[in-house]
Amino acid sequence: MAALDRVKVLVLGDSGVGKSSLVHLLCHNQVLGNPSWTVGCSVDVRIHDYKEGTPEEKTYYIELWDVGGSVGSATSVKSTRAVFYNSLNGIILVHDLTNKKSSQNLYRWSLEALNRDVAPTGVLVTNGDYDREQFADNQIPLLVIGTKLDQIPETKRNEVLTRTAFLAEDFNAEEINLDCTNPRYLAAGSSNAVKLSRFFDKVIEKRYFFKRWQSRFLASRKERDLEEEH
Amino acid sequence: MSFLIDSSIMVTSQVLFFGFGWLFFMRKLFKDYEEYQDAILQTYQDTILSSLIPLAYFLHCSSRYFHWKLNLCVILLILVFMVPFYIGYFVVSNIRLLHRQKLLFACVLWLTFMYFFWKLGDPFPILSPKHGILSIEQLISRVGVIGVTLMALLSGFGAVNCPYTYMSYFLRNVTDADILALERRLLQTMDMIISKKKRIAVAHRTMFQRGEVHNKPTGFWGMIKSVTTSVAGSENLSLIQQEVDALEELSRQLFLETADLHATKERIEYSKTFQGKYFNFLGYFFSIYCVWKIFMATINIVFDRVGKTDPVTRGIEITVNYLGIQFDVKFWSQHISFILVGIIIVTSIRGLLITLTKFFYAISSSKSSNVIVLLLAQIMGMYFVSSVLLIRMSMPLEYRTIITEVLGELQFNFYHRWFDVIFLVSALSSILFLYLAHKQAPEKHMAL
């Protein structure tokens, strides 16, 4: 496969949130039987039908790069990880719904990946702080996924879901909340599956059909600016 | 009256140290994790609080004896009863199956621990029949054995690792080109994994689609045909899967090597700064000190001797005799040995905390962080108790008697001998280990 055909999506998040289980679920539609710590990076491939159901349907291979580690690692580990952030087309941010810190660390994860991949005219963040404007201008599609939904008791569920909704809004991204040990959450036709499909479509569009993506992107920006004005 | 003053000094200093411990705990260890329980914090604090025996050095009154005894009792209580029970409780709560009878299983684990703890005392000559079962001496002797072993292991490793880390003589030369070459290899391996996984995914998809077609009731022969075709396909697939597994293992190795190279490059840059040069200089001193210690340990074992006077008094005596300088030996030796002992304790605590923090980061995850903190507290507690045992060696005679009083009748000579043996073993094995690791690394890069 030539490098031209590649669609690369990073899967980032703290240790133990369930990235490997999630990637396995996305690629094989099966639950991962024996999760163990990811050393370095593990890759898996998902076959995705772009614009499924329309005459323009085309099959693409999406590479899901699951990078292990913690956001507070030593600088040497971070610079080693940085080699995987080259030429990425999309990012899936994974956090654990039972652990608030993992959601907060997502800001740092996204900055780590985006800073590495900054284009010459792109936005540079110098002090590592979260800047909402940067995410508004960010052109790489993001998706926020919360795992371990089954471990949240019913009473706390609303509170947790509101918090994650704010989180997704900050990233200007869609969000999916699921349990990686249960394939039912991503069953075909469910709203989660639709969101996932839309995300992958966005990634492919930005990579291969730039003009089409750009016009859509600018339209949604205009819509959001109008909303904020009111 | 003086008793009150002393008590208040003790309490304030303990609060101070508690503050430090809390800061350390929150800042360094639990920076990235949220899930902790207050009970653990409590236990950790209590352990640190009660471990501050050395503070008694600054109390010049008879109440010192009382405070020492009190601190010791509290530490022992925590070390032997509370912390193991908590550890058992959290280990059990991590295992999903046993959720119902958490307490029961925790008690079972604790009883097992107590049994092994007691058995520990048998092979060692520390049981004197005049004391009862639950006396302080029994408990201290066992805790002392574990703590001394730990201390000797850590000192042995630290004594060898310290010069190795500080001195830039051992630093391998790493250039940017090396790192780039290794990174390229890593990315190439990832690409190969991806292309193989694409083939597997395509094969699965076509089999799935073909399987659907064949699910139509075409009868007996249709089923046989589908079996034969898929058998050939799946054999091919399992071969590719094996290749993928091998490549993934290779990619992990390459990743670890690259991380290692990055770390070495950072160290090289650090050693060019002033701080780095200072540490390099220190490294030479430390290596001499470590060689001396290993030498002394060997002599102690071979010639079966235990030192009678502490090194400071010895040193001062030597200076008085050979250099003819008039010193008030007793006065100076007391203060200098206090200071030296204080420095030794502080540096060893710092070394211990740093090593444990690194270890903690390496093996922690949000599930097991509770257990690890408790293990940390346990280790630190034992370390402190045994350091008191061993410090006795470096102190002048009057103060030795005080420690002997507090800790009861223990066979101190045995502990020193045991420390020397384990220290020697640990130092020699870490030399061997580091030598092998050092040799292996350049060879790997030669093969590039």
Swiss-Prot record, chain A:
BP GO annotations: B cell differentiation; intracellular protein transport; natural killer cell differentiation; regulation of protein lipidation; regulation of Ras protein signal transduction; T cell differentiation in thymus
Presence of the UniProt keyword Membrane in the record: no
Family annotation (CDD domains): RabL3 (cd04102)
Function: Required for KRAS signaling regulation and modulation of cell proliferation. Regulator of KRAS prenylation, and probably prenylation of other small GTPases. Required for lymphocyte development and function. Not required for myeloid cell development.
Entry binding sites for GTP: G16, V17, G18, K19, S20, S21, K148, L149, D150, D179, C180
InterPro entries reported for this sequence: P-loop_NTPase, Sigma_54_int_dom_ATP-bd_1
Record keywords: GTP-binding, Nucleotide-binding
Small GTPase-like as annotated region, ranges: 1-230
Entry's Gene Ontology cellular component terms: endomembrane system
Protein name: Rab-like protein 3
Species annotation: Gallus gallus (Chicken)
Family matches, as PANTHER family: DRAB5-RELATED
Similarity comment: Belongs to the small GTPase superfamily. Rab family.
PROSITE patterns in alphabetical order: RAB (PS51419)
Gene name tied to this protein: RABL3
Cytoplasm recorded as keyword: no
Oligomer status and interactors: Homodimer.
Origin: domain of life: Eukaryota
SUPFAM superfamilies, sorted: P-loop containing nucleoside triphosphate hydrolases
GO molecular function terms noted in the UniProt entry: GTP binding; GTPase activity; protein homodimerization activity
